[in-house]
């Protein structure tokens, strides 16, 4: 079995897969190293002999997690590192080491799945988009605040905007003009993300006409799925790229 980790800014996504055919055996999302250890220790009928991870945390935080995993489970995690080229995709950043590793692995994974031009939109704490042409050249992309950042900025800097997560969830049932603060904020932010997504599609069409694939990933992918007909929703896209970056024997 293989333990795979995607260590983001806010959460750690983990899954355990079989080594033979990459079938997913167990999966979860936690908000701390301690919670990760607790979940993994409670998997009484599942063990793993290998581990690979991608992290956008600081080097010190990543090293600490690697040490914890090594001591707790006697595995040596293999960490993804920046690369100029991977899986037939050429990194388009002027300084390739500055491109976020999770973002890089997501569009490398997307290209690996289709081997054609693709647009990859990742909706997490931040929202990113990336464009890869049919030959594997990364043309660049965009970054904007995701739903959590927009929501928290309004709550932090506007005194009268206060509501809980339950209200936020109810507000997104439909996207008519809000008649309460939670509705107005949640629907407004959602519409901004949908507009962002549609703009990315128009940019992609300017490059390739209709000859490209659209991938959507990240925790808030559902917010834009209905305005992107034909898009492939792939929650574990980063893990597809991670397998290419960190192959295990």
UniProtKB/Swiss-Prot annotation:
A monovalent cation. Ammonium or potassium. K(+) binds at residue 122. Substrate binds at residues 93, 100-103, 181. InterPro entries: ATPase_NBD, Type_III_PanK. It is an enzyme of class 2 (transferase). GO terms for biological process: coenzyme A biosynthetic process. Signal peptide: none annotated. GO terms for molecular function: ATP binding; metal ion binding; pantothenate kinase activity. Keywords: ATP-binding, Coenzyme A biosynthesis, Cytoplasm, Kinase, Metal-binding, Nucleotide-binding, Potassium, Transferase. It holds the Pfam family Pan_kinase. ATP binds at residues 6-13, 125. Gene3D superfamilies: 3.30.420.40. Its cofactor is NH4(+); K(+). Belongs to the type III pantothenate kinase family. Homodimer. This is Type III pantothenate kinase.
């Amino acid at each position: 079995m293989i333990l795979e980790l995607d260590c983001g800014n806010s959460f750690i996504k983990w899954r355990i897969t079989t080594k033979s055919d990459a079938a997913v055996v167990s999966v979860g999302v936690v908000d701390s190293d301690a919670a990760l250890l607790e979940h993994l220790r409670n998997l009484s009928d599942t063990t793993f002999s290998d581990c690979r991870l991608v992290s956008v945390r600081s080097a010190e935080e990543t090293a600490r997690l690697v040490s914890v995993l090594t001591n707790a489970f006697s595995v040596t995690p293999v960490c993804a590192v920046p690369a100029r080229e991977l899986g037939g995709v050429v990194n388009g950043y002027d300084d390739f080491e500055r491109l976020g590793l999770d973002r890089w692995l997501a569009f490398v994974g997307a290209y690996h799945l289709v081997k054609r031009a693709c647009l990859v939109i990742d909706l997490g704490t931040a929202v990113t988009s990336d464009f890869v042409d049919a030959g594997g050249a990364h043309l660049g992309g965009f970054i904007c605040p995701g739903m959590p950042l927009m929501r928290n900025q309004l709550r932090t800097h506007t005194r009268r905007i206060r509501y809980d997560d339950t209200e936020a969830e109810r507000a997104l049932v439909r996207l008519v003009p809000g008649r309460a603060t939670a509705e107005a904020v949640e629907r407004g932010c959602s519409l901004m993300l949908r507009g962002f997504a549609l703009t990315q599609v128009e940019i992609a069409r300017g490059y390739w006409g209709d000859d490209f694939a659209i991938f959507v990933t990240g925790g808030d992918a559902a917010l834009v799925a209905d305005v992107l007909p034909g898009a492939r929703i792939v929650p574990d896209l980063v893990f597809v790229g991670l397998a290419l970056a960190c192959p295990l024997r």
